[in-house]
């Protein structure tokens, strides 16, 4: 379908509407089909493309989370804004989320590497599009770590962009988020994290921590904890842009 957006320059003066095109795209995986949308500017070829990877939890391709009220459509607006500047984009629903729900595994079988593999699959998909002059990977929140790992040793990627990505391993962030909890809770979290970092499942999780450390999600967390963004980013051989705000 075609959309029309109005671009406003820094001067605040209204500009002519920018015509762009949006079409559905699919990626076949071993567990099912991932669905997304590609937005292209109103030109035949020679434009760069940004692969937009959404953040953690039930966040869809538009940046909306089923766990939060309302819709912000942040990633959809990003795609439209990029197109207005002559930059294409591809954004997608992660496996198990929204239109890609059928590609989801059961929670116990999920691994952080699944997301990395999917991102690389989309990069391969884009690399076959002769209209594109270069592929850039953008990840938001947890998607920043996924995109970072997918860009390492990948000659098809020309640049990497982190938007509100973590600069520390996930277990450190989780423990920091517990700073306001009673000491007994903080100690339990540290103890569970120590086991998970060692690759050990924790069978007896207190009821109050089940939402975070339930048995079905522990294998995913074990795989997630092995990724340290401070070490992975050193392996990137492409230009890197890090965007971070004062508030999450």
Regions found by a protein language model. Give the residues of each.
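Short, small-residue-biased leader/transition segments that mark boundaries at the very start
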Residues: 1-5
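N-terminal cap/lid segment of alpha/beta-hydrolase-fold proteins
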Residues: 9-45, 49
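Short, surface-exposed "cap/lid" segments of acyl-processing enzymes
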Residues: 43-82
